[in-house]
A protein has these predicted regions:
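Juxtamembrane helix-boundary/capping and inter-helix hinge elements in multi-pass membrane proteins
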Residues: 3-7, 89-94, 105-108, 147-149, ...
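Amphipathic alpha-helical segments in well-structured domains
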Residues: 11-14, 96, 149, 153, ...
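Short hydrophobic faces within alpha-helices
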Residues: 17, 95-103, 171, 277
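C-terminal transmembrane helix and the adjacent membrane-cytosol boundary/short C-terminal tail
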Residues: 85-97, 169-215
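Glycine-rich helix-loop "coupling/hinge" segments at transmembrane-helix boundaries
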Residues: 139-166, 202-205, 253-259
C-alpha cells in the first residue's frame, strides 16, 4: 500500500505529458502503429512474418470498435491514474495497512474491503466524466471506429453536416438519444458500484477475509501493473509515431525507419493549415 515519493514523481512525469496530448493525435498515432503497414508490422517484417508488402488485414478501424476502445483507454487511463495517485496520497495508507494486518486481512482483500471504498468514492465524478466522454466522442471515433455502421456520435455529426433539412431533425433527435444513452450508462455504472459495495459490506460483516497467498497477491498486482504500463507505453509510442510520420518524405514498407526525412508535407500544405490554425487560436 505504501507509495514511494520518487516512484510517484516518476509516474507523474510520464502521465502528465500524456494527458496534455490531443485525443486526435493519439488516435492517429495508434492508427500508424497497428495498421497493416504500421510500425509494429514493420518491426516484425520480413524476418518474422515474411511480409514484403503490407498484409490485407482489417485491423484498424475494425468492425467491433476494439481499436477505438484501445485508443480511449490509452488517452483516459493517465487521467484516471493521476487522479487516483492524488487521492492515494491523501489517505494515511501506513496506518490503514497496520490496521488491516492486525485484523487478518491480506493485501488484496484489505484493498477491496478498506482502501477501495474510500478511493472509489472520491474518484466517482472523474470516472463518470470519462464515461460521458467515451460515449459521445467524435474525433477519435472518426479515425478508429467502424463507419458501417458508425457510432451514434459520428452519425449525429454527419447528419448535422448534411445540407438536407431532414438530416437536421435526425441530428437533433439523435442528440437526445445520445443524452439518454449517456445518462443510462452513468446510472448503470453507479448501480454496479452500489451492488459491489453492498456485496463487500455483507462479506465484511460475515468476516470473509479471502486469504490469498503472497505469491498470488503479488502476481495479481503484477498483472495489473503490466496492463497499465502496456497502455502507457502504447500512448508514448503512438505519440512518437504521429511525430515521425509528420516529417516523413519517403518511407517504404517494410523499412523500420523512413529513407528520407523532410518538411515537404508541411511546405506543400502550409496554406491549408493557416486558416484552421487561426480558428483554433
Amino acid at each position: 500500500f505504501s507509495q514511494k515519493i520518487n516512484m510517484y514523481t516518476t509516474l507523474k512525469n510520464i502521465i502528465v505529458p500524456l494527458i496534455s496530448i490531443p485525443h486526435i493525435t493519439v488516435a492517429i498515432g495508434i492508427l500508424f502503429l497497428i495498421q497493416p503497414s504500421g510500425w509494429i508490422s514493420r518491426i516484425i517484417s520480413p524476418w518474422f512474418t515474411g511480409w514484403h508488402n503490407p498484409p490485407n488485414l482489417n485491423i484498424a478501424p475494425d468492425l467491433y470498435g476494439i481499436s477505438l476502445i484501445m485508443g480511449l483507454v490509452v488517452k483516459e487511463l493517465p487521467f484516471l491514474l493521476l487522479i487516483g495517485f492524488a487521492i492515494i496520497t491523501q489517505v494515511n495508507l501506513k496506518r490503514y495497512r497496520q490496521q488491516i494486518s492486525s485484523l487478518g486481512y491480506g493485501l488484496i482483500s484489505g484493498w477491496f474491503h478498506v482502501i477501495h471504498p474510500m478511493v472509489a468514492q472520491r474518484m466517482r465524478l472523474s470516472v463518470l466524466i470519462v464515461l460521458c466522454f467515451a460515449v459521445s466522442v467524435v474525433d477519435m471515433a472518426l479515425i478508429l471506429a467502424p463507419s458501417t455502421p458508425a457510432p451514434l456520435a459520428v452519425k449525429i455529426f454527419n447528419w448535422y453536416q448534411s445540407p438536407y433539412i431532414e438530416s437536421q431533425f435526425l441530428a437533433a433527435s439523435g442528440a437526445v438519444y445520445l443524452l439518454l444513452i449517456t445518462i443510462f450508462c452513468c446510472a448503470f455504472w453507479a448501480f454496479c458500484g452500489n451492488v459491489f459495495g453492498f456485496i463487500f459490506r455483507i462479506l465484511s460483516f460475515m468476516g470473509c477475509r479471502f486469504l490469498i497467498s503472497s505469491f498470488v497477491s503479488k502476481s495479481f498486482l503484477g498483472v495489473l501493473i503490466s496492463i497499465a504500463m502496456f497502455f502507457l507505453t502504447l500512448g508514448i509510442f503512438s505519440t512518437v509515431s504521429a511525430g515521425v510520420w509528420a516529417f516523413v518524405t519517403v518511407w517504404q514498407y517494410p523499412d523500420f525507419l523512413p529513407r528520407k526525412w523532410g518538411l515537404s508535407s508541411w511546405e506543400l500544405n502550409f496554406e491549408v493549415y493557416i486558416q484552421p490554425l487561426v480558428n483554433t487560436l
